[in-house]
Structures are given as structure tokens and as C-alpha cells.
């Protein structure tokens, strides 16, 4: 065994062995318990970042641990390869997105493999490959047949200069990110998936996911947004020219008598009707079309509106209510209209105040009145007043009674409403999965026959930013109608990339199956036992995946109900932010690795300078690692300098997995020192003792060795629980570090001590092997020549070693530590109390004082109260 720890040599040796032996190839074995561990697959952006390293190390630790527990483990990897960034990069570099994507995949694959991940690379997939997205297309056609996919118009962001649709993130302050043109809202035909058909099941099944964080389940429940309320119909006031009745859904029917106006979205048919004869309204509608589309944005933007001059009739009082167009009403939610109760809704209050509309209070607190005029909306449940025959009722009785009255008049009824909307999957983009439909003048919309799938995306196009390249490529869109044979045109929209990621975890079970979407192997591996990914995917990706798997279940393709049994959402990786402000006020960011910190004599930070020019830079606190802030750390450089095991160890030790991790160079260096110490401890032991020939004789151990062996087996039990149940990798590592510190203090060189050292080091290598597998692979070969670490089971704590003859008790005086005593484990309490009172260190604090009582926590401490 060489004396020094050289991570590059060691990691090369281990990885070569794993590759040559196909160590992590997963094969179905019905007689074995399976464990399917999956970290969310990455977008091939070009290089790994530290968030990737953390994500995939967590999954690898769990995979390796369960392998040692006897499970048949599957840990695959693939690439979420379609998407807008590839198109942007293609425009910048004048290369097809396909080349950019495949080059990135090749580079990132090498990076991942350098981390020593126990993955079955034979199951690798990329969503941009035709043999993958063929099945997107196939299932989409099945959904069309079942009515779970359909075509209707939808509103999109439109850049009038580039003549292209923009994603929400491409709209910056109302303007296109590339051209700076004011973005318009256009209504175009789009395809939707009917996720609302599964709304109830998606909501109720959250209760069957105890292995998911409560926060994620709550976020999904809120997104689905099931609410119970009343659908109210406000009859049209024909004299005002109102063309139709207005339907409104409300969860606060108790406030119906406080309605002072009705507001509609700019896209509502009533708004369009009113604008035909009113240029000012038409201009306002156009302004709204250039505004925000997202609910979160609407909540913060200034409330604006225009009176249409149209009226509806209050369904119970008969009062005429003005109809306004308001920019805070979304067409995509409810009926695109709201009944406005300014006294009891914050948005309505703000709007009514802005436009001097009436504010009529009809709800008051249970135990007090309301001060009128209101300074703000009173939004709590309370007691109705000024509500005719419904005055004096609490919330639910008022809602029930008003719903009955509306139903009797044919102007309303109780309804269940969902915030969830159907999933619009059409994207007017090139780099995505083609939608398998053909438009024929004679036959209409014609599905591509199954035998003609996949509709292959051409991979040699280079986007220029002006529209969808597919719509300008006749070789793609020109085709013959499958029904009549006449000339026809392919659909040039592509699918939302969330479609690709909604079922990839299923395809891993059978990536070599080319004749069907799935096969029987799916029934063995699925559902995923442990899924790992960022909290930012809590809603869309996870919800769409749950929906997609339920559709596949109902089509008879899979047996499971929920795709992910357990979910771990790892925290972000943070680093310092360093910057300067230029004379023009622009902020220039610098990587913290290029900055020298200045400290005073006490080591306190007093400043920072850029190493390149020696000039000061400002510290902007701690923030998520990102390209925009230039505060990332290159994993490749870290691995090259310290080795993959150091990177893995730091990532697992620096923070519990669900919490944010603050980057610290000192922490990385500390992890490296620990591995060097582990290597040296094994080296020194083998130099002194050689390889052990057999188990140590435990019967004759003295007190010191017994205590050390107790700590060893206590550590084995703790680490197993920390890794397998609690997933607190940092505390598992800390326990091993404490054990190593204790071993380092051992001066005994007797055969028993050397035997105990061998037992301890073997178990330490086993315990650490899921976290730092390379060094452990090599150390095991040194400790146990002729055997391989991968063949070893997880160590089990020796119950006999955990039975203590002697225990150490803490002695407190008034709750403060004042001494320690060692006693036999079966010592009677009265003797323990006497020994505590007689302890020399303790006596200094109690001499001359009256002892009021002695409190004992068996096996732990004695507290003397004076």
C-alpha cells in the first residue's frame, strides 16, 4: 500500500474496475427486493454545476447503501434534451441545436462518470432521440382518441418583429427579449391535454404519498385548487346593449349583496363586443394584451380598467350593475368574469378606490361592527348585514341560503371549481417533439398512422429567431394525407418539453424495447422508490408526471397509481456574491475564487480585493450559484484538484440534504484532509499489524477497548439509520469522524487492540463507501486482500457490544456541567447519588450548601439542585 493518498490514481482504479465488471448493470430479479432510485435528469446545458453534483451524489449514496442492504438497485441516467436554451445557443453559435445538444451530452456524461456514480449507463436515454419521442407521439394519439387531448384556441405572447411566440420568461418588462418590441397577446389554435379530468384523483391521491414533503403536497393541492362555491348568473341588461348573461363563480356567495360592479377579462366576448363601437375600449384591450399573463404578476401590477357602458342585473336585488374591463381578471380562470365586492376583496377594493366605485359592506365581525368608510377590505368570514332576508347569518348558512334562493330563480347553483387548467402543450418552436397530426383540405385534421411514427424532427436546421424553422421547411411540412392521398401539411408546432419529462422514469425500465412504449419490466421496477430533485419542480413536472402515469394506467400500460413513492427535495447550493458598480451604475460580478479577503489582526473580515488588479470589490452576501452572478464553482476543477470523493464528502457533510448548502473552500479542504487521515490511519495500521487473520477475541477486552468497541457498534447503528431512514448524511459522517478521533487516541498496541483497530477500520470503510466509494474500494482491498468491497453487505451492529458493563454519567449542579463519574451499568440509584455527591470536582460547588434534591436521568446524568 502506498503511503500517500493520491485521489486521481485511486479513482481511476476504482472506476476502471466498476466499468470492466459492469458492476451497476441492473437486471430484473423477481426473487429480490428492488430499489429504484432516480435523481431528476439534467438539461444538457454544457457543463455540470454544483447543484447537479449535490443531486446525483444524494441519489448515489442511497443507491449504494441499498445495494449493500441486499436490494436489486436501479439507478439510471438520461437527458432532458429538448428545449428553448438549445435554440438560443444555436442562434448565438450558428450551429443546429442537435449538434449543440449532443456535444453537451457527451461532455456532461464524462463529468458525471468522473463522480463515480453507480449508474446503469446501458439504460441511458435522451428525449431528443426519435426512438424516445416516438412514444410521446403515440400516446398523444391515444389521448386524442379518448378525448384526453383536444384542440382549441389559446392566448400566447407574440413578438411582432420576429413574428414568433415567446415563452413567459422571454418577456421582460412587456418586451421581447431579443427585439425589445412590445409583446402582444395573440389567440391561436393549440392542443391541450385534459389534466382537469384527473383533478379529483390528483388531489385525493396526495394523501397516499406520506413519503413526500408536506410542503410539496400542499403546493400541489393549492395548484389544483379545489374550492366549493356558487355559480351565479347575472342577467344581461338588454337596454344597455349587453349581449349576454354573465356567469361568475364565487366562494363568497355570502357577500353577494355587496356587489357593486362586475369585471371581465380583456379577452372576454363582452369586452370584445363593447370595443367594436368604442375606440378607447379597443385601445385599452390592446394595452391589456401587452400586459402580464401570469397570476403572480397580476397580483402585483397596477389595477387598471375601463367602463364598458354595459350593465347586468343583480340576481337577487334587481339592481343594475356596471360591467368593467379590468386587467386583474384572467380569461383562463373561471368564466373570465368576477363579481366585484370591494368591501370584502382586496383587489376589488383597490380597483374601486382607484375609479371611485361604490364600496358596500355586508359582512361584519362576529363580535363587533365595521368602521365605515372602510380603510381596507374586510376579508374574513363574519356575519351578514344589509343583505335582506339573509342578514344575521354566519358564513356557511348564508352561502347555503343564498345558493337555494339563486337556484329557485334559475340564476345559480352550488358548484365545485378547480384552479387547475388543462395543459396547453403546443409550442411554436423547432427544438421539440413534433405533434403527429396532418391537415388536409378534404379530410380535416388527420392523425399520423402508428406505422408512420415517429414523425422525425429534422436535426440540421439553425433557428434565426424569426418564427418557427419547421414552418419554413417544406421538406418537413409537405406530405400526403394518410386517408385520401392528396397533398397535405404537417403540424409544425412541437410539444411542451414537460411532456418529455412526464414519463422518462418509466422508459428507463425498458429503453431497449423498440416495438412498444413499455413492457413487463415496468411492472418490476416501477414505481420509483426514491425520487430526488429541486423544490422548483414541486408543481409542474411532478404534477404532469402524476397525470401522465395515471393516463398510462387507464390505457392498461402500467399497473401503478403514483409514479414516485418517496420524494427528497434537495436545497440549493449557495456561494458569496462579489461585485463592483461601474460609473454608469452597471453591476459587474466577479467569481469569489478570484477575490482575496482582507482581515484584521483578530481575523475579522475588513474588505475584499480582486486579485487581478488589487482593487476593492463589494460583498453582496450569499446567493444561489448562478451564471448571472458569476459565483459558481466548476465541479471539474474541484474533481481535478481534490478528487471526486472530496467533492462528494463535502456535499454530503456541509448541510442536511433538504437545506441550502453554503459553499466554503475551507470545508472542501477539510473534507480532503479527512480522507488523507483515513488513508494514513489504514496505512499506519497495516504497517504495524499487517492484515488480520481472524476475528478479535472480544471476551478479554479491557475497559478502554470495550468502550471503543461500544462506540464502534453504536456508530454502525447510527450511520445505518441516518443513511437509510433519516437521510441525514451529515450526521452519519460526523459520527464516523468522532469514531476516527477516538481510534486516533488509542495507544494500546496489544493484539486485542490491533484486532479491534482492524474491525473498526473495516467497518469505517463499509460505512463510508456509499459516500466516498473510490477510496473505500481501494482501502478494502488493502484491509481484506482477495475480496471486493462491492460484494460486502452493510455492517450490522453487534448487540453484545452495545451492552455496557460501565457507563459514564454527567453530573450537573443546578443544570450546569460540573463533573463526570463512571459506574457499573447496574448500579443502584442511591449509590449513583452518593458517588455524584462525593465526586471531588462536584464537591467544590456544593460544599457548605444545602442540597434540595437530586434528579437522575438513568444512564445519562445526575443533576444536584442546591
Curated annotation (Swiss-Prot):
Sequence motif 'KMSKS' region, location on chain: 624-628
Keywords: Aminoacyl-tRNA synthetase, ATP-binding, Cytoplasm, Ligase, Nucleotide-binding, Protein biosynthesis
Superkingdom classification of source: Bacteria
Short motif 'HIGH' region, span: 42-52
Pfam family, one: tRNA-synt_1
GO biological process: leucyl-tRNA aminoacylation
UniProt-annotated binding residues for ATP: 627
Secretion signal span: none
EC id: 6.1.1.4
Main location: cytoplasm
Localisation per UniProt entry: Cytoplasm
GO CC terms, sorted: cytosol
GO molecular function: aminoacyl-tRNA deacylase activity; ATP binding; leucine-tRNA ligase activity
Enzyme class: ligase
Aminoacyl-tRNA synthetase keyword on record: yes
InterPro entries: aa-tRNA-synth_I_CS, aa-tRNA-synth_Ia, Leu-tRNA-ligase, Leu_tRNA-synth_edit, M/V/L/I-tRNA-synth_anticd-bd, Methionyl/Leucyl_tRNA_Synth, Rossmann-like_a/b/a_fold, tRNAsynth_Ia_anticodon-bd
Annotated catalysed reactions: tRNA(Leu) + L-leucine + ATP = L-leucyl-tRNA(Leu) + AMP + diphosphate
PANTHER family: LEUCINE--TRNA LIGASE, MITOCHONDRIAL (PTHR43740:SF2), LEUCYL-TRNA SYNTHETASE (PTHR43740)
Family named by the database record: Belongs to the class-I aminoacyl-tRNA synthetase family.
Protein name: Leucine--tRNA ligase
Organism: Nitrosospira multiformis (strain ATCC 25196 / NCIMB 11849 / C 71)
Amino acid at each position: 500500500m502506498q503511503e500517500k493518498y493520491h485521489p486521481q490514481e485511486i479513482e481511476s482504479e476504482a472506476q476502471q474496475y466498476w466499468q470492466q465488471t459492469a458492476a451497476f448493470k441492473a437486471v430484473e430479479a423477481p426473487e429480490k427486493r428492488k430499489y429504484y432510485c432516480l435523481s431528476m435528469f439534467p438539461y444538457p446545458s454544457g457543463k455540470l454545476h454544483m447543484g447537479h453534483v449535490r443531486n446525483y451524489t444524494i441519489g448515489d449514496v442511497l443507491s449504494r447503501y441499498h445495494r449493500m442492504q441486499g436490494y436489486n438497485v436501479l439507478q439510471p441516467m438520461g437527458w432532458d434534451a429538448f428545449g428553448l436554451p438549445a435554440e438560443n445557443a444555436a442562434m448565438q453559435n450558428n450551429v443546429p441545436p442537435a449538434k449543440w445538444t449532443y456535444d453537451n451530452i457527451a461532455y456532461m456524461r464524462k463529468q458525471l462518470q468522473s463522480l463515480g456514480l453507480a449508474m446503469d449507463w446501458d439504460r441511458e436515454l435522451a428525449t431528443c432521440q426519435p426512438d424516445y419521442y416516438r412514444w410521446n407521439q403515440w400516446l398523444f394519439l391515444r389521448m386524442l382518441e379518448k378525448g384526453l387531448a383536444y384542440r382549441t384556441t389559446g392566448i400566447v405572447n407574440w413578438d411582432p418583429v420576429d413574428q414568433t411566440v415567446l415563452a413567459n420568461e422571454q418577456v421582460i418588462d412587456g418586451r421581447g427579449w431579443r427585439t425589445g418590441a412590445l409583446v402582444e397577446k395573440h389567440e391561436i389554435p393549440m392542443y391541450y391535454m385534459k389534466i382537469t379530468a384527473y383533478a379529483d384523483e390528483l388531489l385525493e391521491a396526495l394523501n397516499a404519498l406520506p413519503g413526500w414533503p408536506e410542503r410539496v403536497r400542499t403546493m400541489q393541492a393549492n395548484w389544483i385548487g379545489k374550492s366549493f362555491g356558487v355559480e351565479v348568473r347575472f342577467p344581461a341588461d338588454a337596454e344597455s346593449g349587453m349581449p349576454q348573461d354573465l356567469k361568475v363563480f364565487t366562494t363568497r356567495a355570502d357577500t353577494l349583496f355587496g356587489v357593486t360592479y362586475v369585471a371581465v377579462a380583456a379577452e372576454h366576448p363582452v369586452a370584445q363586443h363593447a370595443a367594436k363601437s368604442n375606440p378607447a375600449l379597443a385601445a385599452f384591450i390592446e394595452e391589456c394584451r401587452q400586459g402580464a399573463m401570469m397570476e403572480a404578476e397580476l397580483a402585483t401590477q397596477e389595477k387598471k380598467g375601463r367602463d364598458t357602458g354595459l350593465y347586468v342585473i343583480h340576481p337577487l336585488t334587481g339592481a343594475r350593475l356596471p360591467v368593467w374591463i379590468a386587467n386583474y381578471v384572467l380569461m383562463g380562470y373561471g368564466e373570465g368574469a368576477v363579481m366585484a365586492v370591494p368591501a370584502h376583496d382586496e383587489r376589488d377594493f383597490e380597483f374601486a378606490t382607484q375609479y371611485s366605485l361604490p364600496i358596500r359592506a355586508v359582512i361584519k365581525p362576529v363580535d363587533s361592527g365595521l368602521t365605515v368608510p372602510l380603510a381596507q377590505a374586510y376579508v374574513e368570514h363574519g356575519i351578514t348585514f344589509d343583505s335582506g332576508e339573509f342578514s344575521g347569518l354566519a358564513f356557511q348558512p348564508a352561502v347555503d341560503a343564498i345558493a337555494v334562493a339563486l337556484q329557485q330563480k334559475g340564476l345559480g347553483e352550488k358548484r365545485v371549481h378547480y384552479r387547475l387548467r388543462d395543459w396547453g402543450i403546443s409550442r411554436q418552436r423547432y427544438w421539440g417533439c413534433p405533434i403527429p397530426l396532418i391537415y388536409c383540405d378534404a379530410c380535416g385534421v388527420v392523425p399520423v398512422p402508428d406505422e408512420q411514427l415517429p414523425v422525425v424532427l429534422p436535426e440540421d436546421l439553425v433557428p434565426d429567431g424569426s418564427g418557427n424553422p419547421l414552418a419554413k421547411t417544406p421538406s418537413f411540412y409537405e406530405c400526403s394525407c394518410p386517408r385520401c392521398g392528396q397533398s397535405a401539411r404537417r403540424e409544425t408546432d412541437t410539444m411542451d418539453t414537460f411532456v418529455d419529462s412526464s414519463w422518462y422514469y418509466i422508459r428507463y425500465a425498458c429503453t431497449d424495447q423498440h416495438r412498444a412504449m413499455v413492457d413487463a419490466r415496468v411492472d418490476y421496477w416501477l414505481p420509483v422508490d426514491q425520487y430526488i430533485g429541486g423544490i422548483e419542480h414541486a408543481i409542474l413536472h411532478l404534477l404532469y408526471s402524476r397525470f401522465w402515469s395515471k393516463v398510462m394506467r387507464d390505457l392498461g400500460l402500467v399497473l401503478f397509481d403514483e409514479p414516485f413513492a418517496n420524494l427528497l427535495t434537495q436545497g440549493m447550493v449557495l456561494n458569496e456574491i462579489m461585485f463592483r458598480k461601474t460609473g454608469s451604475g452597471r453591476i459587474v460580478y466577479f467569481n469569489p475564487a478570484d477575490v482575496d479577503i482582507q482581515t484584521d489582526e483578530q481575523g475579522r473580515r475588513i474588505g475584499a480585493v480582486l486579485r487581478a488588479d488589487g482593487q476593492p470589490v463589494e460583498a453582496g452576501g450569499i446567493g444561489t450559484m448562478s451564471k448571472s452572478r458569476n459565483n459558481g464553482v466548476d465541479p471539474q476543477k474541484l474533481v481535478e484538484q481534490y478528487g471526486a470523493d472530496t467533492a462528494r464528502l463535502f456535499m454530503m457533510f456541509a448541510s442536511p440534504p433538504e437545506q441550502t448548502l453554503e459553499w466554503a473552500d475551507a470545508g472542501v479542504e477539510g473534507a480532503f484532509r479527512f480522507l488523507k487521515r483515513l488513508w494514513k490511519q489504514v496505512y499506519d495500521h497495516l504497517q504495524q499489524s499487517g492484515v488480520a487473520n481472524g476475528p478479535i477475541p472480544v471476551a478479554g477486552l479491557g475497559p478502554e477497548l470495550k468502550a471503543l468497541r461500544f462506540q464502534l457498534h453504536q456508530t454502525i447503528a447510527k450511520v445505518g439509520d441516518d443513511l437509510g431512514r433519516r437521510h441525514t448524511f451529515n450526521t452519519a459522517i460526523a459520527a464516523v469522524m468522532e469514531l476516527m478521533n477516538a481510534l486516533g487516541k488509542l495507544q494500546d498496541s496489544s493484539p486485542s487492540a490491533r484486532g479491534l483497530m482492524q474491525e473498526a477500520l473495516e467497518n469505517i470503510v463499509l460505512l463510508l463507501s456509499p459516500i466516498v466509494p473510490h477510496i473505500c474500494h481501494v482501502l478494502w482491498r488493502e484491509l481484506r486482500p482477495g475480496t471486493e468491497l462491492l460484494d460486502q453487505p452493510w455492517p450490522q451492529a453487534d448487540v453484545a457490544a452495545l451492552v455496557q458493563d460501565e457507563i459514564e454519567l454527567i453530573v450537573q449542579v443546578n443544570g450546569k456541567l460540573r463533573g463526570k463519574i463512571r459506574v457499573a451499568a447496574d448500579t443502584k440509584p442511591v449509590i449513583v447519588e452518593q458517588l455524584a455527591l462525593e465526586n471531588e470536582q462536584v464537591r467544590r460547588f456544593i460544599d457548605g450548601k444545602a442540597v434540595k434534591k437530586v434528579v437522575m436521568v438513568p444512564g445519562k446524568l445526575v443533576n444536584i439542585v442546591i
